[in-house]
From Swiss-Prot:
HIV-1 lineages are divided in three main groups, M (for Major), O (for Outlier), and N (for New, or Non-M, Non-O). The vast majority of strains found worldwide belong to the group M. Group O seems to be endemic to and largely confined to Cameroon and neighboring countries in West Central Africa, where these viruses represent a small minority of HIV-1 strains. The group N is represented by a limited number of isolates from Cameroonian persons. The group M is further subdivided in 9 clades or subtypes (A to D, F to H, J and K). InterPro entries: Vpu (IPR008187), Vpu_cyt_dom_sf (IPR009032). Residues 1-7 are extracellular. Disulfide bonds: none annotated. Homopentamer. Interacts with host CD4 and BRTC; these interactions induce proteasomal degradation of CD4. Interacts with host BST2; this interaction leads to the degradation of host BST2. Interacts with host FBXW11. Interacts with host AP1M1; this interaction plays a role in the mistrafficking and subsequent degradation of host BST2. Interacts with host RANBP2; this interaction allows Vpu to down-regulate host BLM sumoylation. It is found in: Host membrane. This is Protein Vpu. It comes from Human immunodeficiency virus type 1 group M subtype B (strain 89.6) (HIV-1). Pfam families: Vpu. The lineage of its organism: Viruses, Riboviria, Pararnavirae, Artverviricota, Revtraviricetes. GO terms for biological process: receptor catabolic process; symbiont-mediated suppression of host innate immune response; symbiont-mediated suppression of host type I interferon-mediated signaling pathway; symbiont-mediated-mediated suppression of host tetherin activity; viral release from host cell. Belongs to the HIV-1 VPU protein family. Residues 53-65 have a biased composition (Acidic residues). The chain crosses the membrane at residues 8-28. It is a single-pass type I membrane protein.
Length: 80
């Protein structure tokens, strides 16, 4: 009976060690996934800003080109 108790204690210790190792691996992988999500969000934000800045500058230039501008000089120009 004593050997059965020793075997049970050894089995519990081995099971506890295996559980600790498995949960450690799970925790490490979870941190990797979180880090990758942060990187993906940053990349998405950079792409959005890149698209926004590119579109705004082209759009502004097109809008400015479409505007009818008068004389650029602030003084009275009489060139008729």
């Amino acid at each position: 009976m004593l050997s059965l108790q020793i075997l049970a204690i050894v089995a519990l210790v081995v099971a506890a060690i295996i559980a600790i190792v498995v949960w450690s691996i799970v925790f490490i992988e979870y941190r990797k996934i979180l880090r990758q999500r942060k990187i993906d969000r940053l990349i998405d934000r950079i792409r959005e800003r890149e698209e926004d800045s590119g579109n705004e500058s082209e759009g502004d230039q097109e809008e400015l080109a479409a505007l009818e501008r008068g004389h650029l000089a602030p003084w009275d120009v009489d060139d008729l």
